[in-house]
Amino acid sequence: NGMLGSAGFSGHRGDVMTGNYLATLKDNPCYVANYNGSRQANSRSVPDINNTMATDLWANAIEQKQTQYKNTIFGNTSLYANQYRNYNYNYEHIGIEVPDGGNWGNSKDNEVCNAVDYPKESDQQFTLANLTAQKILTKFPDKRFQVYAYSTHADVPSASITINKNIDVQLIPTVYQMESSTNGLRNRWYNRFSN
């Protein structure tokens, strides 16, 4: 994204959507949010927030990537000198943002998985972010997390949803969002949250 700040932002977690994770989604379609009547797993799939196994799998995959990367850097600091020196800046935040163009749940499923209506996309985004942060904080209690308020999930979440204090939200009000004017969306966020 190229935005600057006191710490680097991680961006979309497309890196999670490979190998074992994607295979697990394909083997367990109820883990995938029902998008346009389909639970087909692909690189834009997001976890079904109504399925605890799905949200746990997402959080575990991110935690494992973080642990593996940290162990690699700290296991050979001379080989990874630049990454080691810049570790706190680049990895102060653990990215928990779904893949770009994520297929959020929008279709009621009356068959195998559940018959629950999905809330709006920003509610799904921040429900998943809260669950993910809460789970990963048990292993990395000093970490902060990063998500975007962007595109179809740019809107402020419903009043019933709070955002974990360890989650930093990067508001992107000018790209692909249809909620309101850029300043209108900014004002709604700033009036409600300090994340």
Predicted regions and their residues:
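Catalytic-core regions of glycoside hydrolase
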Residues: 1-195
